[in-house]
């Protein structure tokens, strides 16, 4: 799937939309194309949405497969799948470009230019670096603000995310806890809680 999520912040809805990943010249660069909604986080004003559903603004671009959005105060965070690695946690800022498909910490699939690596440094290509890139991939999924019991336990602001596998060749599911600095703009540390192959709630 393309991946998508949404959050509400003030008078606006922020909606993330993924990018088709088949390597075709027709769709390859949609995340960088300002005339396309694919690979974007868009900003929609709630009060005018019914009358003008297509009246939205591109908030950020260069996204591959966003899986979740959340916020701490006025800061917006996104997690997304990379290709064969390079899953990302991003701090989303207006007008920023996160680089897909021109940079990634993942690797091309074999049908995609013989499995060659992407340009990895986002900053060197004038794109926004992820707050954290997960290599190898953990299949990161939804993300949310940590519940108060975890914030109290760690004595830090934190985000909690699910992953489909823990890696070392993918055994088991896990929970990732991203501990943030005081300004919520850098990762202080990460804790992984292994859940195993069977997850019961």
Protein language model annotation of sequence segments:
Residues 1-9:
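Asp-box/WD-like beta-propeller blade repeats and closely related beta-sheet repeat scaffolds
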Residues 14-17:
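A conserved catalytic-loop motif detector
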Residues 63-66, 196-200:
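Short coil/turn segments at the loop-to-beta-strand junctions that recur within blades
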């Amino acid at each position: 799937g393309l991946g998508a999520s949404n959050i509400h912040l003030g008078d606006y809805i922020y909606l993330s939309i993924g990018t088709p990943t088949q390597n075709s010249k027709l769709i390859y660069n949609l995340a960088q194309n300002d005339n396309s909604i694919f690979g974007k986080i868009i900003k929609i004003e709630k009060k005018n949405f019914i009358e003008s559903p297509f009246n939205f603004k591109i908030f950020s671009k260069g996204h591959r497969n966003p899986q979740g959005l959340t916020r701490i105060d006025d800061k917006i965070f996104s997690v997304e799948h990379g290709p064969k690695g390079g899953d990302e946690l991003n701090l989303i800022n207006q007008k920023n470009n996160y680089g897909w498909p021109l940079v990634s910490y993942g690797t091309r699939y074999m049908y995609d230019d013989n499995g060659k690596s992407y340009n990895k440094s986002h900053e060197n290509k004038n794109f926004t670096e992820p707050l954290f890139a997960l290599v190898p991939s953990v299949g990161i999924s939804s993300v949310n603000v940590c519940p108060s019991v975890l914030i109290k336990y760690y004595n830090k602001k934190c985000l909690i995310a699910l992953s489909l596998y823990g890696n070392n060749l993918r055994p088991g599911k896990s929970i990732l806890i991203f501990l943030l600095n005081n300004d919520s703009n850098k990762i202080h540390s990460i804790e992984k809680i292994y859940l195993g192959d069977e997850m019961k709630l």
